[in-house]
Amino acid sequence: MRIVLITGISGSGKSVALNALEDAGYYCVDNLPPHVLPELARYLADGGQHRLAVAIDARSSASLDELPGLIRSLSLEHDVRVLFLNASTQALIQRFSETRRRHPLSGSPSHDANIGLLSSLEEAIERERDLVAPLAEFGHQIDTSTLRANVLRTWVKRFIEQKNNDLMVMFESFGFKRGVPLDADLMFDVRALPNPYYDHELRPLTGLDQPVIAFLDALPIVHQMIDDIHAFLMKWLPHFREDNRSYLTVAIGCTGGQHRSVFIAETLAARLAHDANVIVRHRDAPVDVDASSRLVTEVDRP
């Protein structure tokens, strides 16, 4: 059975992700107590259901400590994937304010005896971060701070389409002016490279467009940067595998996340497709939803 566990911070988009999985044919359950999960998986498997998605958050805080052990145990019999959704505190506060929803931990006792009850939304968010932080290491992280709901749905679909027999490497382009991604395991700054933005004909385009590709591809310094990053990844990927890592997010950043980072993320993803399962996604580039995230295969290699 394929089991997808969705966890993370309240307000980060778990409901959107769960709905996307339901549309993909998964049997979905929200806020399931972790200790019930093995029994539910057996029950559904006996009934012929082969895809289960479960959202777990701070509302199950009393039994969150059980979840890491359950993940290891379930992985012995099932294809278990963990999706950890995160967002900046500023983005979360704005979302709760817009929806007028109450945070699950608002008014709950603080872990600091000097504070008493968690009176502010920010305190509740930070308390929840502490509670769910141990789960982040088990899953693939997505920072939804700047994502539209339809983009998140697409990224979730790409996540479940990927094979699960090897390390999954996610190349993510972004713009520093919009903030660094919270989900990055490795981050490379390519702002030292010549910027197509200053060519008025290239400015409205992205690193997916042929004129920008031709501009950057003609520059030796761009290839030096790509070669150096690729060599670093090839050296250290075996060590990430030995550490039993399932997911690795490599963030490539330029100023606006539109030209250089997009081109380099695409090029690196194509190069690495022979050596790992690869997804490339573009956080800030003005591209259509389908182009914002895609699987990369060996046929994409240059």
UniProtKB/Swiss-Prot annotation:
KW Amino-acid biosynthesis (keyword) present: no
Keywords: ATP-binding, GTP-binding, Nucleotide-binding
InterPro entries, A to Z: P-loop_NTPase, RapZ-like, RapZ-like_N, RapZ_C
Pfam families: PapZ_C, RapZ-like_N
Superkingdom of this protein's organism: Bacteria
SUPFAM superfamilies found in the cross-reference section: P-loop containing nucleoside triphosphate hydrolases (SSF52540)
Binding site for GTP: 57-60
Keyword Transport annotated: no
Residues that bind ATP: 8-15
GO molecular function: ATP binding; GTP binding
NCBIfam families: PRK05416.1
PANTHER family: RNASE ADAPTER PROTEIN RAPZ
Function: Displays ATPase and GTPase activities.
Family of this protein: Belongs to the RapZ-like family.
UniProt protein name: Nucleotide-binding protein BamMC406_2713
Organism whose genome encodes this protein: Burkholderia ambifaria (strain MC40-6)
Biological classification of the source: Bacteria, Pseudomonadati, Pseudomonadota, Betaproteobacteria, Burkholderiales
